[in-house]
Amino acid sequence: MSAITRIIDKIGIVGTIVGSFSCAMCFPAAASLGAAIGLGFLSQWEGLFVQWLIPIFASVALLATLAGWFSHRQWQRTLLGSIGPVLALVGVFGLTHHFLDKDLARVIFYTGLVVMFLVSIWDMVNPANRRCATDGCETPAPRS
């Protein structure tokens, strides 16, 4: 994964998590953590964060993960990196558009945040390396 893609991925993840810190009505556990670290002033922009910023940052993280696949060609890493942003998007849209129960939407959103955070830590500890050439993978000769 290139340095630009990794930076954009981290920006998307941090933006989604910090955005959830401002939403006391939607995500009380994240908002209480945000208030504890001094981000309580963000609550005045709760509507902006829930309607726009969280979906934008989660989409940025998802697109950066999908773009990273073109450089490392590891479908397992791409799949794990995509689960978190997709869950966060389903949770936030389920809450704002009322197609999910409020408690279920929160659980899905929090699960997405945790998965995004854990995959981000994993990516920092064990960065992706290219497994295949861009034109395809060579298969080993069969053993006789």
UniProtKB/Swiss-Prot annotation:
What are the annotated disulfide bridges? none
Quote the subcellular location field of this record. Answer: Cell inner membrane
Induction per UniProt is:
Constitutively expressed.
Q: Which residues lie on this side of the membrane: Periplasmic?
A: 43-46, 100-103
What domain of life does the native source organism fall in? Bacteria
User: What positions does the entry give for Hg(2+) binding?
Assistant: 23, 26
Give one GO molecular function term: mercury ion transmembrane transporter activity
Q: How does it sit in the membrane?
A: Multi-pass membrane protein
* Name the UniProt record assigns to this protein: Mercuric transport protein MerC
The gene for this chain is: merC
